[in-house]
């Protein structure tokens, strides 16, 4: 029995020895695994929280940037509209100023033109007055000379180079103007030189004025018989053209001074001013 007890005890000792060899290691491995998984979870959670914070910050900044951009766009739009309004206002104001300046310039030019015309008329009146005074002086001298011959131009006529000239202030057709001169024992002016043309222009001014030149009966002729072909001429370029497109019937058979002094052929029925001419001492 003692042997059996010893064997049993020996068996228990062996079992204890084997148990000590296998030991309790499985428990720490499980705990280590659990700890490793928890660390990964914490790390993942931390990274997730960090990522969430970053996303929130970026989202917040993006929203702020969008708001700032919207405000900038609105401010730029307002500035653009305001600038356009100011530009339009300045443009409108500039146009008004430009129109006023043009109006003032136009009025000034008109006043200057009126002054020039008044000055020209005044000079003509002065010249006519001087001519009348000379004519009166001439006639008075003739009377004082007990009828001795002294040749003078009539009052209201102007003497130039041995001829007397009368300048109209009204208008007539060419034929009526020629008849008027004939009643004064004169004829429509016959221009034979540049000097005579300048003299007539100085007294008439820039006006359409009949002269004693016509081709109603064929070729161009001066009313006093002065030779046309070899004499002085001052036609406007392209004239005479005997134009029929004026709608008044017939051609253009009578000559006149234009406003620039050149000659032009025109319809004889047009009403223009005229100049009568006669030799000194022949006028009525």
UniProtKB/Swiss-Prot annotation:
Q: How is it modified after translation?
A: Phosphorylated on a cytoplasmic Ser residue.
Q: Which residues form a coiled coil?
A: 58-122
Q: Which UniProt keywords apply?
A: Calcium, Coiled coil, Disulfide bond, Endocytosis, Glycoprotein, Lectin, Lipoprotein, Membrane, Metal-binding, Palmitate, Phosphoprotein, Receptor, Signal-anchor, Transmembrane, Transmembrane helix
Q: The organism sits in which domain of life? A: Eukaryota
* SMART domains the UniProt entry points to: CLECT
Q: Start and end of every C-type lectin domain?
A: 160-277
The entry's Ca(2+) 3-binding residues are: 239, 241, 252, 264-265
Tissues in which the protein is found: Expressed exclusively in hepatic parenchymal cells.
Residues that coordinate or bind Ca(2+) 2: 215, 242, 252-253
For biological process, the GO terms are: endocytosis; immune response
Q: Where are lipid groups covalently attached, annotated S-palmitoyl cysteine?
A: 35
Residue intervals passing through the bilayer: 40-60
Sugar-bearing residue positions: 75, 78, 146
Record topological domains on the Extracellular side:
61-284
Intervals, Cytoplasmic compartment: 1-39
**GO MF term list:** asialoglycoprotein receptor activity; D-mannose binding; fucose binding; identical protein binding; metal ion binding; pattern recognition receptor activity
Instruction: Quote the cellular component terms of the Gene Ontology held in the record.
Output: external side of plasma membrane
Disulfide topology:
153-164, 181-276, 254-268
Q: How does it sit in the membrane?
A: Single-pass type II membrane protein
Self-association and partners: Interacts with LASS2.
Other remarks on this protein: Calcium is required for ligand binding.
What does this protein do, in the record's words? Answer: Mediates the endocytosis of plasma glycoproteins to which the terminal sialic acid residue on their complex carbohydrate moieties has been removed. The receptor recognizes terminal galactose and N-acetylgalactosamine units. After ligand binding to the receptor, the resulting complex is internalized and transported to a sorting organelle, where receptor and ligand are disassociated. The receptor then returns to the cell membrane surface.
Please identify the protein, giving its name as recorded.
Answer: Asialoglycoprotein receptor 1
Organism phylogeny:
Eukaryota, Metazoa, Chordata, Craniata, Vertebrata
What gene codes for this chain?
A: Asgr1
């Amino acid at each position: 029995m003692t042997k059996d007890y010893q064997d049993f005890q020996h068996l228990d000792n062996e079992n204890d020895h084997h148990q000590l060899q296998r030991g309790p290691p499985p428990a720490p491995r499980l705990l280590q695994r659990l700890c490793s998984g928890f660390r990964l979870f914490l790390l993942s959670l931390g990274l997730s929280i960090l990522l969430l914070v970053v996303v929130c910050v970026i989202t917040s900044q993006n929203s702020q940037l969008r708001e700032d951009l919207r405000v900038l766009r609105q401010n730029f739009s307002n500035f653009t509209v305001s600038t356009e309004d100011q530009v339009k206002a300045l443009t409108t104001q500039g146009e008004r100023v430009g129109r006023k300046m043009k109006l003032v310039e136009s009025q000034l030019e008109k006043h200057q033109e009126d002054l020039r015309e008044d000055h020209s008329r005044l000079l003509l009146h002065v010249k006519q007055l001087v001519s009348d005074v000379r004519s009166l002086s001439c006639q008075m001298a003739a009377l004082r000379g007990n009828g001795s011959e002294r040749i003078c131009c009539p009052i209201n006529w102007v003497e130039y180079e041995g001829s007397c000239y009368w300048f109209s202030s009204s208008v007539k057709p060419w034929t009526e103007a020629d008849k008027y001169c004939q009643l004064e024992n004169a004829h429509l002016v016959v221009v034979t030189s540049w000097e005579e043309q300048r003299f007539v222009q100085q007294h008439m001014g820039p006006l359409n004025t009949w002269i004693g030149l016509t081709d109603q009966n064929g070729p161009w002729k001066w009313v006093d018989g002065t030779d046309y072909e070899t004499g002085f001429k001052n036609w406007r370029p392209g004239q005479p053209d005997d134009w029929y497109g004026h709608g008044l019937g017939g051609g253009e058979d009578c000559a006149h001074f234009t406003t620039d002094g050149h000659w032009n052929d025109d319809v004889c029925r047009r009403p223009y001013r005229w100049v009568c001419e006669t030799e000194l001492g022949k006028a009525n």
